[in-house]
Amino acid sequence: MKERTIIETIKALFKRPFTIKYPYEPSPAPEGFRGKPEVDPEKCIGCGACARVCSAEGITIEDKGAERTISYFYGKCTFCARCEEVCPAEAVKLSREFELSDYDKSAFYVKVTVPLLTCRICGAPFVPKPQLEMGLEKVADLLKKYNIDIEKFRQIVEVCPNCRRKIENIEAGRKILMVMMK
């Protein structure tokens, strides 16, 4: 038995190694590997769906003035891919990158800034502009189908919830909804 083991060991020395020489040679990630989330700031609409589903609280939202900042902190990320699943704009994609260690802390943070739409009446910021534009694009065909003027609809939705309660604008919105629901 010992003799056979020694012979196999000597043969193995001259064959190719069984393991790769990581970290000196890159190791490919397996298929389906969930690595670092990559965020495309051009696609992000600022809806915050990713922050709402992040169980590790690695994604935060902060509204300051007329801007919304969404911050991604990879140090807390569990690579669950929930942010990728819920993003309506497909702005978040998980890469196959797994070597995330770095001495620079700023390498663990990604910030995306999105402008907020201000209310037509009071001027308070209340919804991300790209999110509203995406929503209007999605309902444009439906509005045309029911002969509803898209500009009139835009005026209704560009009023914050507080002002909407105070004016008759909500009645116009209800009428539009009633026409669409028939």
Where do the protein language model's features map onto the residues?
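Non-ligating segments of multi-cofactor redox enzymes
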Residues: 1-64, 74-76, 82-85, 90-182
